[in-house]
Amino acid sequence: MIAKNIDVKLNVRPIYIGLVHEYAYEGPCRFGEGDALEKEYDQMVSRETYEIFKQDVFSHVPAGINMMDPIYLEATDEWVNSEKIYETLSAEIDKIDLFVFNFQIARGFIYVEFAQRFHKPVAMIPHSCCEETLNTAALHARGHEAYAFYSWADYEGYLRALRTRKALQNTRVLVASRFSSVKSYGGTDNFVNLEEITNRLGVKFRNISVHELLDQLHEVDPYSNPTIPGRKGQNINAEDTALAEKLADEFIANADEVRMDRAAIIDTFKAYVLVQKLMDHYECNAFTAPCPDLCSTRRLSEERVTFCLTHSLNIENGIPSACDLDFNSLLTQAVLENLSGKSVYMGNANVCSLEDGKLPTIFGDFDDAHIDHLDDKTNLYSMFHATPTRKFDGFEQPLKKYSVDSFAYSGFGATVRYDFMQDEGQEITVCRIDPTGTKMLAAKGTIVASAGYDGKSCGPLD
């Protein structure tokens, strides 16, 4: 079973710290009269505030967040920093990703020492009188991870972001490579240093030879693969072939149009099923394979497969997947899918500026006819790849309309062909992580045109 990073949960522990005065008195930090100065009154108010706190935090739980049992604590005006406090706070600490606190004046010393002791991310809920900014500043100055929020909507956004960070930390990429497991021959803007990506983001990379992978496409004795003679491979078997046939028939049945042979589609699904087996075997939940250097082996041509459909199906099932060893795209997918709950489209990007009023030839059949309906032909930008998915509306939503055609003109390599005009006017996010892995471009766009639905190779295009 592949442990998908979209299923990762962020474990959050809510903590409320009340303040109980042991004696009745007034002073510069305490004021009131009558029963309001009694210890029992403080305890009553603290409990009431705790109930409000619980209602607030459990009313703002985004998808993928696991709110753990809350903790109630009482500090006193003895200012004794009791060890029992930290024993209580640290219960199940290895399971917890974020501690969310609520308290008011004169309890921040507990918050700060907790972060110093245990080095876990902490946060304060919005609207905690006076305490959010000063305690966050105190911890930032000491080099600790701490958050404060402008509003509950802001709070929920940070929870989603922190869950996405955890999803990245739980991403393990199966890298099929020929010459190099770090260098892409079709994408020089790839990550410069994968070790740095692992150190900073926690993403792990597991390697397999493309030849070892392709050998296992054959339904033969798994000990007979020429690349690993005598060692058991994960070769597809009769059960896997039956599954590939079943998946292919479902793929055909759900399509508006199919323009290639069923047998060739089944071959493509065998590659998909094999990649699932290998990800499961190596305990990975993401996949990438090279393009130009794999293509030039002629093995894809001999095996009559491409990995385009494997990438499409992986992505629409919440498994980051990229051609051309495009690690940047892979991790961008992980970020976007975890934040949005929708599948994404991986594509090559191009500026479409008109020259002498006409669209320059960029790729395939994308020409002026595809943008004639536009009144405004400025600021156009195109993306294309043979890896659209059928789940752009969400992982749990019905399939979008699509057709099926081969990548190769000789009829092999099934691909999803998608008409983006069915999403005309849809606002989208265009996103890319830079080669250093330290910056991300995120921009808004609107779908206004489409091409390549009836074509082959690396389309469709939007």
Regions found by a protein language model. Give the residues of each.
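Short N-terminal or domain-adjacent regulatory/targeting segments
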Residues: 1-32, 145-164
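Anaerobic metallocofactor- and corrinoid-dependent redox/one-carbon enzyme cores
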Residues: 3-16, 29, 37-79, 102-104, ...
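Short hydrophobic segments within beta-strands
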Residues: 15-17, 125, 174-176
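Glycine- and acidic-residue-enriched helix-capping/strand-helix junction motifs
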Residues: 21-51, 181-192
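Surface-exposed beta-strand edges and their flanking turn/coil or helix-capping segments
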Residues: 25-28, 137, 161, 220-223, ...
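Generic detector of short, locally flexible boundary/turn motifs and exposed helical patches
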Residues: 32-36, 62-66, 86-92, 111-115, ...
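Well-ordered mid-protein domain cores that form the structural environment of catalytic cofactors
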Residues: 78-159
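Conserved, well-structured core segments that form the ligand-binding/active-site neighborhood
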Residues: 131-342
